[in-house]
Amino acid sequence: MIELDLCFGLLLLILFGLLSLRNGHVSLAHIRFICQCWLVMITPLEVQDFALCILTVVLLQSFHSFEALLFLLLAYIGQLYMMHSCNLVSFYVCLEAQTLCVVVLCGLLARGASTSFSVEAALKFLLLSAMVSGMALFWFSAMYQRTGSLDMVGQETFWILLVMLFKLGVAPMHMWSVDLYGSIPKSLLLYLSTAPKLSLFTFWASSWHHDFSVGVFILFSMFIGSIGAYGQPALRSLFAYSTINEIGLLLLAVETAGFHTLYQHLGIYIITQLLLWNLTDKRLFALCAVSLAGLPPFAGFFGKAWIFWHAMSVQAFSLLAAALFCTLLSLVYYLRVIRLFWTAPVHTAASFTGAPNQTTLTSACAVALAFAPVMLVKPFVI
């Protein structure tokens, strides 16, 4: 029944948007407000679903066209269903729905001189995604022919793992993410670095279980993410490799610590990303880099320390040594970013003029980044 409610509500929203855009008395802000209310009303009362809803509501503020809002909502529906899918076909359809929405948004939001680069990166992502998804779909059909069932329970799950790792941008399947990070608009970059990762890890925790070790992908992601950032001329490319390194740490949490620690560090990562790509204050940007580097007293330090502590508890010493080495290695280019932005001239007054929503978001995320260690330090002292 909820599927019919979603489809009917989305059709009404499309109709309202198409009619309102022709009316000079109805602005895009009204449509955005209705989209946000609709998201809250349709979301089930579960923690991960509500977190994805709140994140999408925040991300809607960065998009300034009705078409972009519509595709963002379609991607949200795909993510919401994928998080609770227990069937191979439903997982495939929902996952590809959000992929197609991202590709279309790359074309819609491309502006200026970076248009060709954005379209090229989107096409690379689409073709690589189609290749991986096609191979997975062939495997799904082979499983159905052999077992007569499409349920995930009792099936061999290697191709599901491979598709998920590709969508997360895990090394060595990461080149599409570097191209996209360097060419797409900032609003879409903020979406791509947060919402899909939350939905994929939630699906991993709630609907899907595997017997494969991801230790090889952890090592690839951490080493490529920490080494590949050196020599990058663009800041976006640097943070693309930083994201690959962070994904390696999140996989290390899955491998050694469990999903509670995963959600803890993923929440810190999302808050930091919301700050990074919404800032015009350069010194606050530098503080976000401090948290990403894992330096105390910010939340990023305690998130990484909690993962390392669990890795030591389960005696995964090889992964722990690699993670510590890559963290120290990545600290060098984070310090370059900190030096660059902390010593730059600050224009605080211009940073917050005429953007009340952005100011509220920045303030809330900055408070969370600073005071989250108060909660994260409890396991170490109790």
UniProtKB/Swiss-Prot annotation:
It is a multi-pass membrane protein. PANTHER family: NADH DEHYDROGENASE (PTHR22773). It catalyses: a ubiquinone + NADH + 5 H(+)(in) = a ubiquinol + NAD(+) + 4 H(+)(out). Pfam families: Proton_antipo_M. Belongs to the complex I subunit 2 family. This is NADH-ubiquinone oxidoreductase chain 2. It comes from the Eukaryota. Keywords: Electron transport, Membrane, Mitochondrion, Mitochondrion inner membrane, NAD, Respiratory chain, Translocase, Transmembrane, Transmembrane helix, Transport, Ubiquinone. The keyword Membrane applies. Its EC number is 7.1.1.2. Core subunit of the mitochondrial membrane respiratory chain NADH dehydrogenase (Complex I) that is believed to belong to the minimal assembly required for catalysis. Complex I functions in the transfer of electrons from NADH to the respiratory chain. The immediate electron acceptor for the enzyme is believed to be ubiquinone. Its main location: mitochondrion. GO terms for molecular function: NADH dehydrogenase (ubiquinone) activity. One of its GO terms (cellular component) is mitochondrial inner membrane. The keyword Nucleus does not apply. It is found in: Mitochondrion inner membrane. The chain crosses the membrane at residues 1-21, 33-53, 54-74, 88-108, 123-143, 158-178, 188-208, 212-232, 239-259, 260-280, 284-304, 305-325.
